[in-house]
A protein has these predicted regions:
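Conserved, mostly hydrophobic/aromatic
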Residues: 3, 28, 51, 89, ...
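Metal-dependent enolase-superfamily TIM-barrel catalytic cores that perform enediolate-based chemistry
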Residues: 116, 121-258
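Shared catalytic-loop signature of beta/alpha-barrel
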Residues: 51, 65, 237, 243, ...
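Extended hydrophobic packing segments that form well-structured cores
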Residues: 377-395
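Structured beta-strand/loop patches that form or line metal/cofactor-binding pockets in enzymes
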Residues: 1-32, 36-37, 352-356
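Metal- or metallocofactor-binding catalytic centers and their adjacent structured scaffolds
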Residues: 24-101, 107
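Short amphipathic alpha-helices and their capping/turn segments at secondary-structure boundaries
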Residues: 97, 102-104, 150-161, 379
């Protein structure tokens, strides 16, 4: 069996594209993967095309060998777009390898450890606060403008069966809601240490969410790269009374993150932007996180499983970084089923209504859980006709 053709297609995912890689073989098997090129990596399809040319005529079942060769070919430019491109190619080859063996991907890695994956609703309220017009007109979902809206959102999360939900810093005022992202601007602004007014706004946000959800919903709070370690520490101490399941924070220094972990009164989740075991190892050695977040489209599921094994050796649980589209949900599910040290699976519950129409078989999601697909490969292919009905045309 040899790789014959490689191509990308892109579907409308609302505020970002859903990008899919298709690898066809001369044996009639086709492999798929999803990758993310919309927010930070606009040239990723071109990098994939250039690297994929090197695997034409090769056997996709030797995915580990192919990935090693591709990584060697970009030795002087590791990580970044090159790593993401290699992961996209490898993930599609793994889909083919599992289909050729007649097994689900998790079985290819010796699993599944579990067939039902616990979920959390990611960015709960965050995109409604940022893109109120789109959510109201296109998705038919209410805007998020007031603390009362935040309270109603907490009740909605529980009504939709979620037991865990994650939100981001949102400030409410008479002008509406503002999604706070101070870390996504140039420089190291002193404001990222957070003043009292910002902390009070965040505290009020989480209080409203808790009031609406009740005592049994686990709340995760994601501040991302938004603060200095000092600011993250202030958030952690201020939000202690809300019994967070974790605080999510990212800094580039293993030592600084480890110090922060020792100063906040709740578990710390982090590391979603790292590549490969070598990228994670300094953080594991420093004891920098309670939960290591691993991006399957960026790393490839094979390397993600290896990262999870390294985390397990340091007594650390893992969770997939998964704010992507429909096929990435399946990829994340197979990762979650392939490792013993799973914490929980991320999913976007506020998404376009045609999301799972883009798959040939929709996943089963109910009562805060995701059922692992049973069919060979990822368990579904990309529905190319549906993609054609919802093309990405926003650049």
């Amino acid at each position: 069996m040899r790789i014959a053709r490689v191509a990308s297609i892109h579907a409308d995912g609302g505020w970002r594209p859903f990008s899919f890689l298709k690898i066809e073989t001369d044996a009639g098997l086709t492999g798929w993967s999803e990758y993310s090129q919309g927010l930070w990596s606009p040239a990723l399809p071109q990098v994939i095309e250039a690297l994929a040319a090197r695997v034409i005529g090769r056997d996709p079942r030797g995915f580990a060998t192919l990935s090693a060769e591709l990584h060697a070919s970009v030795r002087f430019a590791p990580g970044g777009l090159n790593a993401q491109a290699i992961a996209a190619i490898e993930n599609a080859c793994i889909d083919i390898a599992a289909k050729a063996a007649g097994v689900p991907v998790a079985r290819l890695f010796g699993g599944p450890f579990r067939e039902r994956l616990p979920l959390y609703w990611s960015h709960c309220g965050s995109f409604r606060a940022r893109d109120g017009d789109y959510f109201e007109t296109t998705l038919g979902r209410p805007r998020l403008e007031t603390l009362d809206d935040m309270k109603r959102l907490g009740a909605e999360a529980v009504a939709r069966g979620f037991r865990v939900a994650k939100t981001n810093p949102i400030a409410f005022s008479d002008k509406g809601a503002t999604l706070l992202n101070p870390g996504f601007v140039p420089g190291f602004d002193p404001g990222r240490a957070l003043d009292g007014a910002t902390l009070a706004a965040i505290d009020a946000q989480v209080e409203a969410f808790r009031d609406g959800a009740g005592p049994d919903l686990d709340i995760l709070f994601d501040a991302n790269f938004g603060c200095t370690p000092e600011g993250f520490g202030r958030i952690g101490r201020r939000l202690e009374r809300h019994r967070l399941r974790w605080l999510e924070a990212d800094v580039h220094s293993p030592a600084a993150l480890a110090d922060l972990r020792g100063r906040v009164p709740m578990p710390l989740a982090s590391l979603e932007t790292l590549y490969g075991r070598r990228g994670y190892q300094p953080y594991f050695q420093a004891g920098a996180a309670d939960v290591a977040i691993v991006d399957v489209p960026w790393n490839g599921i094979a390397e993600a499983v290896r990262i999870a094994a390294l985390a397990e050796a340091h007594e650390i649980n893992v969770a997939p970084h998964n704010f992507y589209g429909p096929l990435a949900d399946l990829m994340a599910a197979h990762f979650c089923a392939s490792v013993p040290n799973l914490e929980i699976m991320e999913i976007e519950a506020d998404d376009v209504p045609w999301k799972y129409d883009l798959l040939t078989v929709a996943p089963r999601i109910a009562d805060g859980g995701f059922d692992l697909p049973e069919a060979p490969g990822w368990g579904a292919d990309v529905n190319e006709a549906a993609v054609a009905e919802h093309p990405w045309g926003k650049g």
